[in-house]
Amino acid sequence: MRGRLFVMTGASGVGKGTVRAKVLERTRLFYSISMTTRPPRPGEVDGVDYYFVDRPTFEALVREDGFLEYAEYVGHLYGTPRAPVERALSRGEDVLLEIEVQGALQVKRAVPEAVLIFLLPPSLSELKRRLVYRGKDSPEKIQKRLEQAEWEIRNAHLFDYVVVNDVLEEAVADFLAILTAERRRSGRMGEALEMALRRDLALEAELDEILRRRYGGTGH
């Protein structure tokens, strides 16, 4: 059975990376590492947090249709390399993407069965506090991120699920509950299809036997 594609998204500063790390500790998922043209932040490692590349390299991959999705956010390009995701899904592995909102909506258009989970801050004032205390952005960039966040929050209804990241452990538990529910739903669908196929095969065998008895041959 082909794997499921889960997409975590939300405003910058909402805590996607922290929630994602906790989720990956507690369940089996293939985590797809994104590519970006922004410079690494202190402590970030190339090939672990992101693949850090220059703009010409990124744009060359765009021309080769090498991204499942890509978008520009606050002056930098972000994208999900297509090949690793496709390989993992084909192996039957469930895949997790942690990407920007624009990219998540692109994925939903390209892969309608993808499950989009929007991570929401408890309030915009709390989001601003987190961005300020993170200490990574200038006041101008923080304001730009907040304006972007307002638009994203207004469009949260476009996503399959919304998780409020107020208390970290509660947000992680909610995220894991969504994964469990979706996996069970997929399992039930697979079982239902298998049962339907078995019924069809049994009916075909029964009809063949009736025809054989009636006409001394088969129905084929």
UniProtKB/Swiss-Prot annotation:
Query: Which Pfam family, just one, is annotated for this protein?
Result: Guanylate_kin
Q: Which UniProt keywords apply?
A: ATP-binding, Cytoplasm, Kinase, Nucleotide-binding, Transferase
Q: Which SMART domains match?
A: GuKc
Q: Any idea which positions bind ATP?
A: G10, A11, S12, G13, V14, G15, K16, G17
Q: Where is the signal peptide?
A: none
Protein's organism: Thermus thermophilus (strain ATCC BAA-163 / DSM 7039 / HB27)
What is this protein's name? Guanylate kinase
Q: Which residues form the Guanylate kinase-like domain?
A: 3-180
What are the GO cellular component annotations?
cytosol
